[in-house]
Amino acid sequence: MTYNIVALPGDGIGPEILNGSLSLLEIISNKYNFNYQIEHHEFGGASIDTFGEPLTEKTLNACKRADAILLGAIGGPKWTDPNNRPEQGLLKLRKSLNLFVNIRPTTVVKGASSLSPLKEERVEGTDLVIVRELTSGIYFGEPRHFNNHEALDSLTYTREEIERIVHVAFKLAASRRGKLTSVDKENVLASSKLWRKVVNEVSQLYPEVTVNHLLVDACSMHLITNPKQFDVIVCENLFGDILSDEASVIPGSLGLSPSASFSNDGPRLYEPIHGSAPDIAGKNVANPFGMILSLAMCLRESLNQPDAADELEQHIYSMIEHGQTTADLGGKLNTTDIFEILSQKLNH
């Protein structure tokens, strides 16, 4: 079998971190004996510059046919038209592929807790996953309007939309430490009242999982004061967007956090959670670990290569533990150095 992968380098540092990761994929495929083909497409701001829109039909159709999609990063101050922004291409891609699940792991690597802005004893051993609903909620709700005197956004969820994301979270928790924290604002929001009701109903199907409910403001506090208490966190779109960014700084850098977005069938999208960092684009100083860890998720989930994913992750964790990092993590290596060291380790 030959896996079909669509590569979307995007903007800013996206091309350099994605292209380097693809060089690692070539080494890994030879080592673990599997076949793939890459289809490159412009996306985001780069696509606006070339085609006048952030996501063309050609790119969208290629993504629909793919086994996996690897995305570098999109956006930047260059693209200011509110009706034609790079981010709108990503929203359209998520909606078109029905990517209703977003998975964001946060892991504090052994020996690297000193990198965190929080006290070492508070974060050491943190290993949590945020499961965010990605295609409903206030980002997609109708009606919405804006004028100089009034603006309206609508936060809507159906039972079916809540059930499908909650089932994903319960299954993930059952495969890990068996703890699920459901986050809502049930004390004031009607949508959260339905959310909590559905979570409690679905929990009856997963007796092996312990469920805890937290209001979103309390959860944001506990993520800082005691992140080690969490295993799997599930939440709606807006809450997940905010909490996952908060959690991502716990290990010490946005550059350490991968993510995956998927539906019940079809291709999965893998990307680091950081932005395009146009201020350092082309300077060979970008931290590529988030992109490489996203590749590891792709190897495990879409390419059926769990051993390869494990090896890649262990090499990364070892490098971080021994200070072989870029400047944002206190190291002295550049982007190329990271890829060269990983290439040597994989070829060993």
From Swiss-Prot:
It holds the Pfam family Iso_dh. Belongs to the isocitrate and isopropylmalate dehydrogenases family. LeuB type 1 subfamily. This is 3-isopropylmalate dehydrogenase. Catalyzes the oxidation of 3-carboxy-2-hydroxy-4-methylpentanoate (3-isopropylmalate) to 3-carboxy-4-methyl-2-oxopentanoate. The product decarboxylates to 4-methyl-2 oxopentanoate. SUPFAM superfamilies: Isocitrate/Isopropylmalate dehydrogenase-like. GO terms for biological process: L-leucine biosynthetic process. GO terms for cellular component: cytosol. InterPro entries: IsoCit/isopropylmalate_DH_CS, IsoPropMal-DH-like_dom, Isopropylmalate_DH. Its cofactor is Mg(2+); Mn(2+). It comes from the Bacteria. The record marks Y139, K185 as: Important for catalysis. Mg(2+) binds at D217, D241, D245. Pathway: Amino-acid biosynthesis; L-leucine biosynthesis; L-leucine from 3-methyl-2-oxobutanoate: step 3/4. It catalyses: (2R,3S)-3-isopropylmalate + NAD(+) = 4-methyl-2-oxopentanoate + CO2 + NADH. The keyword Oxidoreductase applies. Binds 1 Mg(2+) or Mn(2+) ion per subunit. NAD(+) binds at residues 76-87, 275-287. It is found in: Cytoplasm. Substrate binds at R94, R104, R132, D217.
